Every structure is written in C-alpha cells, then in structure tokens.
C-alpha cells in the first residue's frame, strides 16, 4: 500500500496521487520530488540538490531515483552533480550542515552554492 505522508508538506495533487489504487506502490509506482535545480545562468553551471531536515537521509528508493537522474545528467554541459544537503534542524542557521555526508559550515555552503569548490 502506498505510504501516507507523515507531515503537512504535500500538495493537493500529491495527496490525490496517494489515494489512487490504480497507481499504488504495490504495483511498482513510486514518486519523489526534487528540491532544487540550482543554476548560475551567467556561467551555465548547474546542479541538483536534495534537502533533508532534522538529520534525515534519503530513503533507499529516493537514492535509487537520484542515482538514475545523476547518471542521466552526467556529461551534460555545466552539470556539477547531484548533492544531498542535510540540516541537523531546519536550516544552516540552527544546527550542523552535512553536504554529501561531510560536515561543513555556512561559509562553505555559500562557496558550494557559488560553485567554488566543495563537491564540484
């Protein structure tokens, strides 16, 4: 049976999807959203970022989807990868930051978002 959301962060469409037996996860259907497509339109550099809060990590099915997307994008002009950004709480301002499982600080996060180093 399709897993119901445990939070209030879904859209009406997302809620509707979960109620449809014709596309239930037991039939093989899964869905996941992607949090950020981050781009510098002046340089053409771009990357994909999945944000997790409260120290959560992507579920196995999400990792599989994200790896599939990363492989499809690999080699595209300006593509700088698919990255997982985990906040200990809700943002860089209220706790630790993990980028691709490595702890960084807010300044390093800004460098990363400017495509100036980390993981790029």
Q: In which residue ranges do the predicted regions lie?
A:
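Catalytic cores of nucleic-acid endonucleases
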Residues: 29-31, 44, 53-104
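Domain-level recognition of nuclease-like catalytic cores that cleave nucleotide substrates
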Residues: 5-6, 11-18, 83-120
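Conserved catalytic cores of phosphodiester-cleaving nucleases, focusing on short active-site segments
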Residues: 36-38, 45-54
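Active-site metal-binding core of divalent-cation-utilizing nuclease and nuclease-like domains
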Residues: 1-41
